[in-house]
Amino acid sequence: TLVSSGKDVYIHYAAPEFAFALANDARSKAAVLYCEPGGYYERDAEFTKPVVACVVERWKSRLTRAVGHAGAMAGGEDDAAAKERWFMDKFGVDGLYTPERPVFSAKGAVVTNIAHIPAALTAVMRANADLARALLHKLAAALPAAACPTCLSKRRLNRGW
C-alpha cells in the first residue's frame, strides 16, 4: 500500500485515517507513506503494520522566503526535520535509513530519498519475518509435542528442537 500525505487531493483524509484503513485492510501487509512539510497530519497516526515513511523537501528549511502551498507555509514545528523525528520515535529508530547506514526496526524506517524505499521496505519486512519466526519457535517450545511450522520437526517434552 502506498499513501501520499500531499495535502491537495485528500485534505480531509489525513494520515490517521490512512493508518486506520491500513490496519483494517487484510490485503495490505505494510505501507509507504510519502510526507511533505507542513501540517500535523502524520503526528497522530498510529500504525499497527510496518511503514516506511519518506519525508521530503528538507531543503526548504534553508530558504529565507516561504514557498509552497499554504499548509507548508503555515506551520511551526512541522517541517521535514520535525516529521522525521516523529516517525523515528514511532518506529523506535535513531536515524534515517540509507544504504550506508540502514537504520530500521520491525515497525518501520524513515527515508528522505525515494530511491531508498525498496531497500528500506525489504529490510523492515525481513525484520517482521524474523520476528514472526521467533514467535513461532517460542510458541512451539511452550507447547508439549508441538510441531514447529518453520523447521517441521517435533519437539519432545524437556528437550530442544
Where do the model's predicted regions map?
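Catalytic-core regions of core metabolic enzymes
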Residues: 1-161
